[in-house]
From Swiss-Prot:
The keyword ATP-binding is annotated on this UniProt entry: no
Entry-linked CDD domains: KPHMT-like (cd06557)
Family assignment from sequence similarity: Belongs to the PanB family.
Listed GO biological process terms: pantothenate biosynthetic process
Assembly and interaction partners: Homodecamer; pentamer of dimers.
The name this protein goes by in its record: 3-methyl-2-oxobutanoate hydroxymethyltransferase
């Protein structure tokens, strides 16, 4: 299993880092078999697998539950787990206790926090406490309630400078990597070159040190609309939906199960059932 020191070396050597967001045992197993470098258990599970309208309702217990499943499916892959909405905006002690709970109970190797500002100090204190932290800048989904959209961030010179300053701040605080989401590729390149820690892009162009996409987006599973930055490598919904429809049709028509899908018993045993001939 790769560790933070390995990710630093990959950046140094120009080897791209691959991260895939997964939420359960079978998807994590697939990701590990594909030899991805990292798995992110994102609070996006709230929308992707729990059916919420946003990530806001996701709880620490949700994150622990799904991370434990991912851990069972990917026993030899570095796992990063999101700290959900408002679990790191209270006191430093509350933040440390929430991170401790996630790491100890789920087996995650690191936690991810969105934003900068007061979050920078939380990253520093978690790092001091021995908890590896991945930062997340640009489009931060937990803040969509304030920003009102999932549009690209940091397009103006002022916003770009602010993001650069924040990236340097979270690096100085001890973050082991930074996710850069939905920012101009030119800015992502400058940030990546300015930092000594890896940048993982999603909608941030080719020049970041690595890339992350959601498992479901990659394979086309349960997706009604794809973001511009998502490339579909498969569309398994096109296989799943007719398969399920065929099952329903065959059960209604009494053509499933066939004999080959059933078990039998010896006729003499059947005749002797409850002493009846």
């Amino acid at each position: 299993m790769k560790r933070p020191v390995d990710f630093f070396a990959m950046k140094e050597n120009g080897e791209k880092i691959t991260m895939i967001t997964a939420y359960d045992y079978p998807s994590a197993k697939n990701v590990e078999q594909a030899e991805a470098d990292m798995i992110l258990v994102g609070d996006s599970l709230g929308m992707v697998v729990l059916g919420y309208d946003s990530t806001v309702p996701v709880t620490i217990d949700d994150m622990i539950h799904h991370t434990k499943a991912v851990k069972r499916g990917a026993t030899d892959t570095f796992i990063v787990t999101d700290m959900p909405f408002m679990t790191y905006h209270g006191s430093v002690n509350e933040t440390i206790q929430n991170a401790r709970k996630i790491i100890q109970e789920s087996g995650a190797h690191a936690v991810k926090l969105e934003g900068a500002g007061e979050v920078v100090n939380k990253i520093a204190r978690l790092t001091e406490a021995g908890a590896p932290v991945v930062a997340h800048l640009g489009l931060t989904p937990q803040s969509v309630g304030l920003t009102g959209s999932y549009k690209v961030r940091a397009k103006s010179a002022q916003e770009a400078q602010e993001l650069m300053d924040n990236a340097l701040a979270v690096e100085a605080a001890g973050a082991i990597a930074i996710v850069l989401e939905a920012i101009p590729r030119q800015l992502a390149e400058k940030v990546s070159k300015a930092l000594s820690i890896p940048t993982i892009g999603i909608g941030a162009g080719l020049e970041t040190d690595g890339q992350v996409l959601v498992y479901h987006d990659i394979i086309g599973y349960g997706i009604s609309r794809r973001a511009k930055f998502v490339k579909a490598y498969a569309d398994i919904d096109e296989t799943i939906e007719p398969a399920l429809a065929s099952y329903v049709k065959e059960v209604k028509a009494e053509t499933f199960p066939e004999v080959k899908h059933s078990f039998t018993m010896a006729e003499e045993d059947l005749k002797g059932l409850y002493g009846r001939e």
